[in-house]
Curated annotation (Swiss-Prot):
InterPro entries: GTP_cyclohydrolase_FolE2, GTP_cyclohydrolase_FolE2/MptA. Belongs to the GTP cyclohydrolase IV family. NCBIfam families: PRK13674.1-1 (NF010200). It holds the Pfam family GCHY-1. It comes from the Bacteria. It comes from Cupriavidus pinatubonensis (strain JMP 134 / LMG 1197) (Cupriavidus necator (strain JMP 134)). Its EC number is 3.5.4.16. This is GTP cyclohydrolase FolE2. Signal peptide: none annotated.
């Protein structure tokens, strides 16, 4: 018999007291795939986000209300941008009756690009992550982008009579924001400092351009992170960052890798 007596009040087990007196820094749901709308320069476009949502749980409370995380995503369907993301973060803390919490959402982001010679247009996809957290009343927002580029080895070019080994590389920038920073602007910082950027569609004249451009602009993995770091350092919208470059070496079965981390609040003159 599944009938429920209207007079019966179901117990709220999660809100009961816990006697172990151990707080939990982060508890919530992970890997929730949900439709999102992205606010872009081209307008509002549909996408799919993978969400991780969690809150702080006080020592005296037994559990959090897991269903409320998903209910939040269903209720708050505004197009995703930095302003609406901050609102989503505030709403989560209100809904979960929490003092601290964190939201992370990863989604594919498409940018229309024009080939350098033929002018054909195509889409390039980038993996983008927005992370927001509230701790001790302070809100912090991070924008992360994984940007695929081409790198060409300066040493290989120098020692060879002709040619040089080159490969696809991944530039990952996770920046803490002090102001509005479009995804496109962050992506361009990486692409403009690579040996050459990538396009989704190229014709033969474009392939010639890309090959020669990379050859004329060789960079070690160390060069990549240093040159991009100079761009991040100069941008006042960015207060801190973790910058990674990984070259998938075409002549080895391993990658070359470099990382630069900086918090401008701790190193204001660096």
């Amino acid at each position: 018999m599944n009938d429920i007596n209207p007079a019966f009040v179901m117990p709220d087990v999660q809100s009961s007291r816990d006697t172990r007196q151990i707080p939990i820094q982060r508890v919530g749901v992970k890997g929730v795939r949900y439709p999102v709308s992205l606010k872009t320069p081209a307008g509002v476009v549909p996408s799919v986000g993978t969400f991780n949502l969690d809150v702080h749980l006080p020592a005296e409370v037994k559990g959090t209300h897991m269903s409320r995380f998903v209910a939040l995503l269903e209720e708050e369907r505004a197009p995703l941008e930095l302003a609406s993301f901050r609102v989503l973060l505030d709403k989560m803390l209100e809904k979960l009756e929490a003092e601290a919490g964190r939201i992370e959402v990863t989604f594919p982001y498409f940018i229309s690009k024009i080939a350098p010679v033929s002018g054909v247009e195509s889409l390039m996809d980038y993996e983008v992550t927005l992370t927001g957290e509230i701790r001790n009343g302070v809100t912090r927002v991070f924008l992360k982008a994984l940007v695929p580029v081409t790198s060409l080895c300066p040493c290989s070019k120098k020692i060879s009579q002709y040619g040089a080994h080159n490969q696809r590389s991944h530039i990952t920038m996770n920046v803490e924001l002090a102001g509005e920073l479009p995804v496109e602007a962050l992506v361009r910082m990486a692409e403009e400092e690579a040996s050459c950027e990538l396009w989704g569609l190229l014709k033969r004249p474009d392939e010639k351009f890309v090959t020669e451009r990379a050859y004329e602009n060789p960079k070690f993995v160390e060069d990549l992170v240093r040159d991009i770091a100079m761009r991040l350092n100069a941008d006042e919208r960015i207060v801190a960052y973790v910058l990674e470059a990984e070259n998938f070496e075409s002549i080895h079965n391993h990658s070359a890798y470099a990382v630069i981390e900086r918090d401008k609040r701790l190193e204001p003159t660096a």
